[in-house]
């Protein structure tokens, strides 16, 4: 009888159940299982390719759209960038009002524009450094004519020898009176080899004086030596050629001289010119070979 009453009570209240000892055990609510089943169904629907588009758009990453600036906006932004590369918040807001853009867009544009400006500055500095080191590394040393345009390889000897003495002025003048002392004691005289080379030309034409062109060719003669003075010396002195040669040797570019060699050369030159100098002989009838000494004295014209 009691067992039947208990079974009826269990049937009426299914939430309670008695064990063998008579202790009740609460049962789990059914709505919890239903919520878990609902969440599992949502995950399955989201994982399936044919799920709802709203659930897929939430999980996808939002893509940023590129801003396309008009020519008026770019002109205004560039003009402001030339004045101020780091605008503050208020300036950016004013620019945004002028250009019909948002402050965030203006801030991003200035950031990108500064990055481009720095990149251009670095590239220009690299080009300048490369250009400055290209010449020493590529050609090692630039050509000599480019570094020193006033000096060339062809005109070194004339500049080294002729101009220093040709431009020098002497306090005395050359004439027929003082040519002799200058010939005996020249101020500048060449070595014996050069003096010996001038001997044949002087001995070949005794009594003649080389012209001013010849004197300039020998040693770039001094400007004080006039042609008239040389010609007058040639007429008055039989050794005018030797004096002229010695005077030409005096203007030679050799500063250092050997007095012994110069004096010997001048003495040899004078001796050769004196030997070549001779008076014209009187031409008469040849003496007869058979005449006696007395007849030869009578027959010879007086």
Swiss-Prot record:
Please give the Pfam families that the UniProt record associates with this protein. Homeodomain (PF00046), OAR (PF03826)
Tell me the compartments it is located in. Answer: Nucleus
Query: Which GO terms of type biological process are on file?
Result: anatomical structure morphogenesis; animal organ morphogenesis; cellular response to glial cell derived neurotrophic factor; dopaminergic neuron differentiation; lens development in camera-type eye; lens fiber cell differentiation; lens morphogenesis in camera-type eye; locomotory behavior
Pinpoint motif Nuclear localization signal by residue range: 268-272
Xref: InterPro entries = HD (IPR001356), Homeobox_CS (IPR017970), Homeobox_Pitx/unc30 (IPR016233), Homeodomain-like_sf (IPR009057), OAR_dom (IPR003654)
On tissue specificity, the annotation reads:
Highly expressed in developing eye lens.
Motif OAR, residue range(s) on this chain: 262-275
For region Disordered, the annotated ranges are 1-71
The record ties this protein, via CDD domains, to:
homeodomain
User: Phosphoserine-modified residues are where?
Assistant: 52, 57
User: What SMART domains does this protein map onto?
Assistant: HOX
Basic and acidic residues bias: start-end ranges: 31-43
Any GO molecular function: DNA-binding transcription factor activity, RNA polymerase II-specific
UniProt keyword list: Activator, Cataract, Developmental protein, Disease variant, DNA-binding, Homeobox, Nucleus, Phosphoprotein, Transcription, Transcription regulation
Which terms in the GO cellular component ontology are assigned?
Answer: chromatin; nucleus
Annotated region of DNA binding: 62-121
Main role? Answer: Transcriptional regulator which is important for the differentiation and maintenance of meso-diencephalic dopaminergic (mdDA) neurons during development. In addition to its importance during development, it also has roles in the long-term survival and maintenance of the mdDA neurons. Activates NR4A2/NURR1-mediated transcription of genes such as SLC6A3, SLC18A2, TH and DRD2 which are essential for development of mdDA neurons.
Q: Which disease is it linked to?
A: Anterior segment dysgenesis 1: A form of anterior segment dysgenesis, a group of defects affecting anterior structures of the eye including cornea, iris, lens, trabecular meshwork, and Schlemm canal. Anterior segment dysgeneses result from abnormal migration or differentiation of the neural crest derived mesenchymal cells that give rise to components of the anterior chamber during eye development. Cataract 11, multiple types: An opacification of the crystalline lens of the eye that frequently results in visual impairment or blindness. Opacities vary in morphology, are often confined to a portion of the lens, and may be static or progressive. CTRCT11 includes posterior polar cataract, among others. Posterior polar cataract is a subcapsular opacity, usually disk-shaped, located at the back of the lens. Some CTRCT11 patients can present a severe phenotype including microphthalmia and neurological dysfunction.
Quaternary form? Interacts with SFPQ.
The UniProt entry's sequence similarity note says:
Belongs to the paired homeobox family. Bicoid subfamily.
Give the protein's recorded name.
Pituitary homeobox 3
Q: Which organism is it from?
A: Homo sapiens (Human)
């Amino acid at each position: 009888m009691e067992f039947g009453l208990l079974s009826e009570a269990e049937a009426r209240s299914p939430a309670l159940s008695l064990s063998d000892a008579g202790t009740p055990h609460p049962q789990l609510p059914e709505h919890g299982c239903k919520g878990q089943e609902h969440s599992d169904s949502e995950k399955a629907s989201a994982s399936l390719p044919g799920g709802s588009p709203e659930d897929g758009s939430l999980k996808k990453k939002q893509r940023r759209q590129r801003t396309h600036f008009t020519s008026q906006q770019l002109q205004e932004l560039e003009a402001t960038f030339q004045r101020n590369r780091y605008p503050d918040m208020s300036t950016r807001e004013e620019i945004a009002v002028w250009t019909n853009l948002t402050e965030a867009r203006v801030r991003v544009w200035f950031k990108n524009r500064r990055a481009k400006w720095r990149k251009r500055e670095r590239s220009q500095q690299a080009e300048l450094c490369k250009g400055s080191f290209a010449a020493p590394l590529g050609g090692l040393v630039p050509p000599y004519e480019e570094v020193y345009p006033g000096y060339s390889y062809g005109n070194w000897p004339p500049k080294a020898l002729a101009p220093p003495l040709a431009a020098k002025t002497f306090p005395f003048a050359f004439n027929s009176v003082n040519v002799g002392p200058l010939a005996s004691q020249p101020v500048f005289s060449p070595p014996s080899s050069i003096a010996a080379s001038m001997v044949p030309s002087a001995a070949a034409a005794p009594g003649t004086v080389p012209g001013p062109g010849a004197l300039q060719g020998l040693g770039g003669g001094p400007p004080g030596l006039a042609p008239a003075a040389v010609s007058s010396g040639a007429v008055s002195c039989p050794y005018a050629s030797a004096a002229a040669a010695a005077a030409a040797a005096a203007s030679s570019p050799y500063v250092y001289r050997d007095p012994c060699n110069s004096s010997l050369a001048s003495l040899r030159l004078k001796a050769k010119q004196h030997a070549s100098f001779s008076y014209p002989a009187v031409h008469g009838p040849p003496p007869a070979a058979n005449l006696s000494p007395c007849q030869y004295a009578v027959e010879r014209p007086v």
